[in-house]
């Protein structure tokens, strides 16, 4: 990390922290994070947002920084992490496609179908179908 970057971070911290020990501790933790400069700036910005909204407990913040649980791993991002995990799971195990389980109105039995949960958990799954002969699509 170059000197200009260190000075910029120190200025940002001095603006929001009054205790010199906290500034020093916060700066030392930040400059030793192995995730790079972008992550460090995200941490500082997240801290400033927490400080401005009066949600900041400095001890909690130090613990999160030390364990690198700030920014994306922070509890304020739980819903986004859940969506990201669902997308990752879909990419790791894509939908299974069945052939011949449904008959098309054109008479062909070469229909590809798959099930997907599109409504709430207590509703049944939706079945999407595509006829390979007439290219007709429908949802059951």
Curated annotation (Swiss-Prot):
Pfam families: Zn_ribbon_TFIIS. The keyword Transferase does not apply. InterPro entries: Znf_TFIIS. SUPFAM superfamilies: Zinc beta-ribbon. One of its GO terms (molecular function) is nucleic acid binding. The keyword RNA-binding does not apply. One of its GO terms (biological process) is DNA-templated transcription. A zinc finger (TFIIS-type) spans 100-139. It comes from the Viruses. Keywords: Metal-binding, Zinc, Zinc-finger. Zn(2+) binds at residues 104, 106, 131, 134. Belongs to the IIV-6 349L family. This is Putative transcription elongation factor S-II-like protein 349L. It comes from Invertebrate iridescent virus 6. The lineage of its organism: Viruses, Varidnaviria, Bamfordvirae, Nucleocytoviricota, Megaviricetes.
């Amino acid at each position: 990390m170059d000197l200009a970057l260190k000075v910029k971070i120190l200025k940002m911290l001095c603006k929001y922290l009054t205790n010199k020990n906290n500034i020093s501790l916060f700066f030392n933790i930040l400059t030793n994070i192995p995730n790079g400069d972008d992550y460090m700036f995200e941490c500082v910005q997240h801290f400033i947002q927490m400080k401005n909204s009066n949600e900041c407990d400095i001890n909690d913040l130090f613990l999160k920084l030390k364990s690198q649980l700030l920014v994306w791993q922070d509890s304020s991002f739980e819903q986004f992490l859940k969506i990201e995990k669902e997308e990752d799971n879909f990419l790791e195990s894509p939908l299974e496609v069945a052939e011949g389980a449904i008959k098309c109105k054109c008479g062909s039995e070469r229909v590809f179908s798959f099930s997907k949960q599109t409504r709430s958990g207590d509703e049944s799954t939706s079945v999407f179908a595509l006829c390979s002969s007439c290219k007709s699509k429908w949802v059951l």
